[in-house]
């Protein structure tokens, strides 16, 4: 479960940046094609945050859809599955977004 290591890194990054202030909320953006399971990150967050400035903070996750351009026909397509096909039947998609994993917002007091 790589989400544990990812969540540890998120907590560590936020804790370094807040300068000892208490964090009340963290908003993450996770692309549907990132390979990161949002529910697993939620499960790990409280464990990783324990004993840090993030202890007790609320975690909000915004899931981002994927988009790509078909290399065969040039059509833009929504891509929420790594095995998605274009309407023309081609699997040769240039994924433009949906692979993101970023900290969008941090609220501190």
Predicted features along the sequence, with ranges:
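A short Gly-Trp-Pro
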Residues: 34, 38-61, 72, 95-101, ...
């Amino acid at each position: 479960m790589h989400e544990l290591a990812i969540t540890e890194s998120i907590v560590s990054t936020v804790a370094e940046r807040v300068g000892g202030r208490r964090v009340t909320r963290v908003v993450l953006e996770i692309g549907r094609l990132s390979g990161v399971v949002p529910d697993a990150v939620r499960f790990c967050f409280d464990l990783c945050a324990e004993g840090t400035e993030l202890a007790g903070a609320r975690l909000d996750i915004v899931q981002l859809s994927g988009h790509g351009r078909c290399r065969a026909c040039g059509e833009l397509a929504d891509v929420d599955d790594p095995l998605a096909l274009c309407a023309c039947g081609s699997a040769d998609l240039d994924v433009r977004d949906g692979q993101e994993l970023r900290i969008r917002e941090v609220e501190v007091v």
